Swiss-Prot record:
Belongs to the ScpB family. The gene is scpB. This is Segregation and condensation protein B. One of its GO terms (biological process) is chromosome separation. It is found in: Cytoplasm. It comes from the Bacteria. It comes from Staphylococcus saprophyticus subsp. saprophyticus (strain ATCC 15305 / DSM 20229 / NCIMB 8711 / NCTC 7292 / S-41).
Length: 182
């Protein structure tokens, strides 16, 4: 087992994000046997990261020792405004849910992982695993409804309404602080 294989495994899981990769995908991409994959995972040693096994899926995660620091970072970031990419992704999810990350990228025409991770970290969007799909589907949360002061998704402005009203509706989120969870 080469050091290069460990790096490739880490890069693959990092790229896959919180959806991870299942064992079969890893075996095919790395062109290795199951025992070699097990050895690679057991030998993986990073000061801040670990490989978690959930069912048949492997995910690169942070180690528990870093959780307090990560919480501080998330708290600081949640007080910051949403980026334009996050706003676009949020509106796409709100109007078209459920969607996968790849659906959002197809609509936006650009990688949206960072924006989606921000929305999930702020509690505005959640990823749910669908029984008939290997990918997670993205949905808005109750917090999303609360932030916008609506009770149901049906209360979102429709595209039949003025574009300014829709723009104003979503620009409210830019001014929201992440700690308004009431």
């Amino acid at each position: 087992m080469a050091l290069q294989d460990k790096g490739i495994l880490e890069a693959l899981l990092y790229t896959a994000g919180d959806e991870g990769l299942d064992q079969q995908q890893l075996l095919e991409i790395l062109e290795i046997e199951p025992t070699t994959l097990t050895e690679l995972i057991e030998a993986y040693d990073s000061p801040g990261l670990t490989i978690q096994h959930y069912g048949n899926t492997y995910v690169l995660t942070t180690k528990k020792e870093a959780s307090d620091y990560i919480e501080q970072l998330i708290e600081q970031k949640s007080k910051m405004k949403l980026s334009q990419a996050a706003m676009e992704s949020l509106s796409i999810i709100a109007y078209n849910q459920p969607l996968s990350r790849s659906d959002i990228e197809l609509i936006r025409g650009i990688n949206s992982d960072g924006a989606v991770k921000t929305l999930i970290a702020r509690g505005l969007v959640e990823a749910k695993e669908e029984a008939d799909s290997r990918s997670h589907q993205l949905y808005t949360t109750e917090l999303f409804l609360n932030v916008f002061g609506i009770e149901h998704l049906d209360d979102l402005p429709t595209t039949d309404e003025e574009d300014e009203e829709i723009e104003a509706f979503f620009s409210n989120l830019v001014n929201q602080k992440g700690d308004n969870h009431e």
